[in-house]
C-alpha cells in the first residue's frame, strides 16, 4: 500500500528546458521528515520537458492540451489530483535554494489550522539585473513585519488600499496551501493574479496567511524594455479589473514616480559602486523605470484601448496565444 504524502509539490510546465531540469532535481532532493509527492502538469511541451520528468519514476506526470491551460484552472486541476493535506505550488523556473525549502514552508503553515496559505521569499538569479536583485530584496523584506496576518481591522481594510495589498499579496511561484481550505475556496479561473485573488478570498473568509522567509526560491526575469512595458501593462490591467487599483493614475504620477524610482536606483548604484561594473544596467535603469510606469498608465486604462492594441501590449496574452517566447506558456 502506497504511503500517503503530507505534501504534493505541483509544478505546471510548458517547454521548461534546462532550468526546469534543475528545478525538478532540487525538488525531488528535498529533505523532509514526512513523505511528499511531485506532480507535474504539462500543457503541450515540444522540448524535452516530458523526458526530464520521466527521469524520475517517483514524479507523477499529467498532460493537458495547451488550449486547456489557465493559471487558476490548471492549478485547480493539480490540487484536485493531490493526495495530500498540503499542496506546494511553484513554477518551472522557481529554483528551491536548498534541500530544506519544502520543510521550511510546511513548518510555517502546519501548526495553525487557521492559516490557509503561506508564501516564501524570492531571490534573483546570479545573472539578474542588479536593480532587479535589489528590488526583490526590498519587496520581500517588507513582509518581515507581517509573518502571519488576518483581517483584524475591517474598517481599515475597507479604506486603506495599502493594508489590503499587504493582506492579499501572495505568490504561487513559491507557496503552500491547505487543501481543506482550497476545497471551499478554489482558485479563480483568470488569466492573471489568480494567487492574489485567492488570497483575498481566504482573508475575507476569516483565514490567516503566512510568510516563510526561510523558504527561498531563486526566481527572476531579465526583461527587455518592451517586455517590461508589456509585463507592467498586464499587472496594471489586471489590478484595475480585479481589485479596482489604479497603479498610475495620471501623467503627472507617471513623471513623479519615474523621478523617484530613478533617484532611488541611482543612489543604490552609487552606494554599491555599480557604474564601473554594471554600466549598462545603470544607464538603462531610467528607461526601464519609464517603461514600467508607462505600462502601468496604459494598463490602468486598458478597457479604453482597441482590442488589437490591448493584445499587442499584453505579454501574458501573447504568450498564451503562442505569439511570444517561452513556448507559448504564460509566465509567472
State what each model feature region is:
Residues 1-26:
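N-proximal low-complexity "stem/linker" segments adjacent to membrane-targeting elements
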Residues 154-177, 239, 243:
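A recurrent flexible, glycine/aromatic-enriched loop bordering the glycosyltransferase active site
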Amino acid at each position: 500500500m502506497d504511503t500517503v504524502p503530507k505534501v504534493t509539490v505541483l509544478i505546471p510546465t510548458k517547454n521548461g528546458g534546462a532550468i526546469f531540469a534543475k528545478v525538478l532535481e532540487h525538488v525531488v532532493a528535498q529533505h523532509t521528515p514526512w513523505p511528499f509527492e511531485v506532480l507535474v502538469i504539462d500543457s503541450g511541451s515540444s522540448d524535452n520537458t516530458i523526458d526530464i520528468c520521466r527521469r524520475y519514476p517517483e514524479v507523477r506526470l499529467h498532460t493537458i492540451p495547451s488550449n486547456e491551460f489557465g493559471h487558476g484552472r490548471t492549478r485547480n486541476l493539480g490540487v484536485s489530483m493531490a493526495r495530500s493535506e498540503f499542496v506546494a505550488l511553484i513554477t518551472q523556473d522557481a529554483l528551491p535554494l536548498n534541500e530544506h525549502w519544502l520543510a521550511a514552508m510546511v513548518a510555517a503553515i502546519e501548526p495553525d489550522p487557521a492559516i490557509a496559505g503561506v508564501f516564501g521569499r524570492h531571490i534573483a538569479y546570479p545573472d539578474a539585473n542588479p536593480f532587479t536583485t535589489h528590488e526583490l530584496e526590498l519587496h520581500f523584506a517588507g513582509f518581515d513585519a507581517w509573518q502571519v496576518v488576518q483581517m483584524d481591522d475591517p474598517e481599515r481594510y475597507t479604506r486603506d488600499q495599502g493594508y489590503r495589498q499587504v493582506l492579499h499579496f501572495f505568490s504561487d511561484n513559491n507557496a503552500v496551501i491547505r487543501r481543506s481550505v482550497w476545497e471551499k475556496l478554489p482558485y479563480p479561473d483568470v488569466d492573471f493574479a489568480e494567487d492574489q485573488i485567492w488570497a483575498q478570498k481566504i482573508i475575507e473568509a476569516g483565514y490567516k496567511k503566512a510568510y516563510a522567509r526561510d523558504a527561498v526560491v531563486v526566481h527572476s526575469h531579465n526583461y527587455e524594455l518592451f517586455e517590461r512595458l508589456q509585463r507592467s501593462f498586464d499587472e496594471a490591467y489586471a489590478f484595475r479589473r480585479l481589485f479596482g487599483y489604479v497603479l498610475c493614475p495620471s501623467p503627472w504620477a507617471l513623471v513623479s514616480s519615474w523621478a523617484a524610482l530613478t533617484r532611488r536606483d541611482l543612489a543604490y548604484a552609487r552606494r554599491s559602486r555599480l557604474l564601473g561594473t554594471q554600466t549598462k544596467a545603470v544607464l538603462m535603469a531610467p528607461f526601464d523605470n519609464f517603461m514600467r510606469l508607462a505600462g502601468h498608465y496604459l494598463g490602468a486604462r486598458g478597457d479604453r484601448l482597441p482590442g488589437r492594441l490591448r493584445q499587442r501590449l499584453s505579454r501574458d496574452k501573447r504568450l498564451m496565444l503562442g505569439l511570444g517566447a517561452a513556448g507559448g506558456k504564460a509566465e509567472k
